[in-house]
Amino acid sequence: MNMNKKIDYIIKGINIKNDTNSGTISCEIADKATYTPEFLNTASNVVVCGLFNQQGQGKYGLCWAASVATIVNYRNGTAYTAKNVADRMGIEYNTGGTLENASLALNLYGVMYKAIYNQISWTLVKKNIDQKRPIYVAATSSGNGHAVACFGYKVNNQKKYVYSWNPGTQSTSIVLYKTAGTTFSYNNSVWTWKYTAARNG
């Protein structure tokens, strides 16, 4: 068998690319040319993106990469993992990633977001979600960092809420949006939205 041959497989709609020259494996949806990101639901008071192949971080410090992969997969119809993103960026799995790392990774996968050094306004949250663009959220707690993907919003009784995908728990939460600092609970700590990667305008 020629070990220098590039081998591709298509399994149940997933195109698994095994490049034996580099020893890397990547995955993408075979019919992504026809893929269009969709909303889970839309109404006058709620808009939620229907996430596609959302990713967890596993046992590693890959929340940043899993959040990037979740956004990229929804936008592009792919099936990248957190490890795929970290490998492409050349970052070790337990090193963690900065806002700049996440923004660059998104851009490399064709999701042209900017690094924004604060929590974005409610107007900008709505604008991004309305355009089917989940938001990369970097939060802090006692000097530590954690990343999630914001993929929806709603208004109920004049209160504003955001939907987030947490790669640490591989689950969705709905939390109150607060102009002074949106918070969420994870791993027995309270985390505050600190930085953002999104379309800025």
Spans of model-derived segments:
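Conserved active-site-adjacent core of cysteine acyl-enzyme catalytic domains
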Residues: 4, 8, 18, 84-201
